[in-house]
């Protein structure tokens, strides 16, 4: 039997699989774990009372996180003319139209977010099979197809969580990094859940926010008490 590492021992000692933790307790556990050679993200999984097979119960959107994600995102923008100039001024890393499309087709995807002006969708639409599977396809529902590309770039750079419920009815997204304070994570969680509550489908019945789990990239999943987050604060 292999020997447990210090990290594994701490997880076994501090995380009980059947217990519901407060956010403060969960963040404390993640921050106390022995550090790895890279900066871990803090991720959240939210089980919703929806049926994603029904088109009117697909919950998706984007939330500007007050404390950011701790990661600087590379942003590509499909735009031309004044919109392209505005995107560059806002800090976009790559801006273009057909030339940018050729880069994408060649496999040059060195960016985390793709934004498009409405008149650029004729070009972007041809890239669906490349961008779609990577979660990079611009969509107006999450604010990445917009006439105000500068604002979208600023939001992405400042720290924005985009999300879409998966086939199991769960939303997964990043809300910070290990090392964030409890207050920073709390601000981000509250902002995210406020948006998710507002996006509750009218046809969703019963408990909407069923389960919340906090984790780090290589850390344990810690179940939070969902009750405090089911109503607006």
UniProtKB/Swiss-Prot annotation:
**What's in the GO CC field?**
cytosolic large ribosomal subunit
Q: A GO molecular function for this record?
A: structural constituent of ribosome
Q: Name one GO biological process term.
A: regulation of translation
Gene3D superfamilies attached to this UniProt entry: 3.30.190.20, 3.40.50.790
Entries under InterPro entries matching the protein: Ribosom_uL1_bac-type, Ribosomal_uL1, Ribosomal_uL1-like, Ribosomal_uL1/biogenesis, Ribosomal_uL1_3-a/b-sand, Ribosomal_uL1_CS
Matches recorded under Pfam families: Ribosomal_L1
CDD domains referenced in this protein's UniProt entry, alphabetically: Ribosomal_L1
Keywords attached to this Swiss-Prot or TrEMBL record, sorted alphabetically, are: Repressor, Ribonucleoprotein, Ribosomal protein, RNA-binding, rRNA-binding, Translation regulation, tRNA-binding
Tell me the subunit arrangement: Part of the 50S ribosomal subunit.
Describe the family membership recorded for this protein in Swiss-Prot or TrEMBL. Belongs to the universal ribosomal protein uL1 family.
What the entry lists under PANTHER family is as follows: 54S RIBOSOMAL PROTEIN L1, MITOCHONDRIAL, LARGE RIBOSOMAL SUBUNIT PROTEIN UL1M
Q: What is the role of this chain? A: Binds directly to 23S rRNA. The L1 stalk is quite mobile in the ribosome, and is involved in E site tRNA release. Protein L1 is also a translational repressor protein, it controls the translation of the L11 operon by binding to its mRNA.
Name it.
Large ribosomal subunit protein uL1
Q: What organism is this sequence from?
A: Psychrobacter sp. (strain PRwf-1)
């Amino acid at each position: 039997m292999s020997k447990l590492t210090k990290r594994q021992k701490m997880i076994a000692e501090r995380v009980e699989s059947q217990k519901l933790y407060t956010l403060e307790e969960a963040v404390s556990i993640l921050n106390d774990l022995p550090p790895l050679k890279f900066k871990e993200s803090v991720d959240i999984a939210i089980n919703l009372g929806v049926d994603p097979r029904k088109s009117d119960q697909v919950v998706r959107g984007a939330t500007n996180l007050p404390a950011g994600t701790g990661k600087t995102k590379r942003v590509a923008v499909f735009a031309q003319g004044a919109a392209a100039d505005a995107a560059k001024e806002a800090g976009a890393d790559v801006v273009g139209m057909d030339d940018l499309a050729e880069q994408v087709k060649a496999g040059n995807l060195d960016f985390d977010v793709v934004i498009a002006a409405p008149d650029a969708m004729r070009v972007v639409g041809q890239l669906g099979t490349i961008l779609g599977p990577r979660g990079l396809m611009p969509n107006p529902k999450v604010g990445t197809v917009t006439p105000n590309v500068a604002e979208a770039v600023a939001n992405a750079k400042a720290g924005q969580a985009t999300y879409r419920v998966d086939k199991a009815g769960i939303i997964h997204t990043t809300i910070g990094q290990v090392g964030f304070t409890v207050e920073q994570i709390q601000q981000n969680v509250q902002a995210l859940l406020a948006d998710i509550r507002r996006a509750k489908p009218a046809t969703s019945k019963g408990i909407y926010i069923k389960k919340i789990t906090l984790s780090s990239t290589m850390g344990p999943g810690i179940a939070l008490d969902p009750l405090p987050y089911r109503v607006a604060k």
